[in-house]
A protein has these predicted regions:
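Immediate post-signal-peptide N-terminus of mature secreted/exported proteins
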Residues: 12-64
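C-terminal motif of bacterial Sec signal peptides marking the signal peptidase cleavage site
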Residues: 6-9
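Intrinsically disordered, glycine/charged-rich N-terminal periplasmic/extracytoplasmic linker segments
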Residues: 47-149
Length: 149
């Protein structure tokens, strides 16, 4: 989590150019790739609380179903399966973000531009998949919880 704080604290997504400070506009392919990687990271971090809240809501819904009479549980079995799947999706999204943050090395191959470009291209793809997992799992869980039964 400390790495996440550093990423968020050190990355300014604004494009203003203050006197004496360099502009945040990407100037090279490396800069552009790093900006795209950080954008993916920021989307993930901005949804971390929502992931946590949604996990709690899905768990509460599953707990509520488990307390119903057997006949009602049987009627809600297909919905419970969907909720279980949504819970797994949310858990995976959290896991994927944590794993990506642990493994990401902001300074990887700084002295070898070709290796750096390849590394950042790969990381852009990875963080894109993480972002997709986060957004899709949140949308799925949200639509299930809003469903009228």
């Amino acid at each position: 989590m400390a790495a996440a704080f550093v990423f968020v604290a050190c990355h300014n997504s604004g494009k203003e150019d203050h006197t004496g400070h360099p502009s945040n506009e990407p100037k090279t392919q490396e800069d552009s790739l790093m900006a795209e990687v950080m954008d993916g990271h920021e989307v993930g971090m901005s949804k971390s609380k929502k992931l946590e809240d949604m996990q709690a809501k899905v768990k509460a819904a599953l707990d509520s179903i488990s307390k119903l009479p057997a006949k009602a549980q049987q009627q809600l079995a297909p919905y419970k399966i969907q909720l279980d799947s949504a819970a797994s999706g949310l858990s995976y999204a959290v896991y994927a973000m944590d794993k990506w943050m642990e493994e990401f090395n902001m300074d990887s191959a700084k002295d070898n531009i070709e290796a750096r470009i390849k590394y950042l291209t790969d990381e852009k793809m990875k963080v894109g998949k993480v972002k997709e997992a986060i957004l899709n799992s949140l949308a799925t869980a949200d639509s299930l919880l809003r469903a009228k039964l």
